[in-house]
Amino acid sequence: MDKKTLILKIKSGEITDDAALKILDDKGYEDIGEVAKIDFARKDRRGFPEAIYCASKDDDSLVKIFKAFYQRRESVIGTRASKRQFEVVKEVIKDVDYSELGQIITLDYSKESEKIGEIAIVSAGTSDLPVSLEAEITAKFLGANVKTYRDVGVAGIHRLLDKIEEIRKANIIIAIAGMEAALATVLAGLVDKPIIAVPTSVGYGANLGGITALLSMINSCAEGVSVVNIDNGYGAAYQACQINKLIAKGSK
């Protein structure tokens, strides 16, 4: 948090004087015993705040981490969170929101901030919705305008072509698909924007839990396709927001 923002939060009563002194005295991170070293300086250093990977964390650790952000009135996103984990956090911090399908907890103090640019999130099938939601919620949390285009896979390519003019207006496109994952390549052949491809684990046996989709996207014959890890909607959205932010700044 920069000093100007800190002063404004003190004046508005969002944080106490003691909490402000703690922020001024810290080294950019907060050591929570044996649990975590929270990187509060990450937003200043990288442009976006730290994220919490919830899946492998015990309840006590997860609550302590979210509580540290809450006490500073800092926004944070938690990925791969179960409904039970959300309920545990919600008991302590009432301000958190949750998407059960997207498996994301958000503590967002910047909901009303103006969004910038435009990211198109294009997913092949309804089964890809959890990954699509993870990407959508993350991108909105990180400050981007987002438009979603769902169930427009190549098995019914007319559905994609019907939306292609809208998709072309975006600064960057996230393409999400399982099975043979042809969507990213088809899109790349139709637009002049960079594409971040997300292979999903959706598919029958030879899909190999998303490996087939991953290799298909990596081997795309169309230029301009970069690929993130299997089911990694968060990672795709983060990268897309970095690019979107640069484009939005350049257009001013």
Located regions from the model:
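C-terminal binding/interaction regions
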Residues: 123, 127, 165-168, 172, ...
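Glycine-rich phosphate-binding loop
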Residues: 162-200
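Short glycine/serine/threonine-rich phosphate/pyrophosphate-binding segments
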Residues: 60-62, 128-133, 157, 177-187, ...
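Glycine-rich oxoanion-binding loops at beta->alpha junctions
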Residues: 104-106, 145-166, 211-212, 228
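Short glycine-rich or small-residue beta-strand-to-loop segments that form or flank ligand, phosphate
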Residues: 49-52, 76, 118-124, 173-175, ...
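Long amphipathic alpha-helical segments
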Residues: 1-82, 86-87, 91-92, 96
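Glycine-rich phosphate/diphosphate-binding loop of Rossmann-like nucleotide-binding domains
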Residues: 116-156
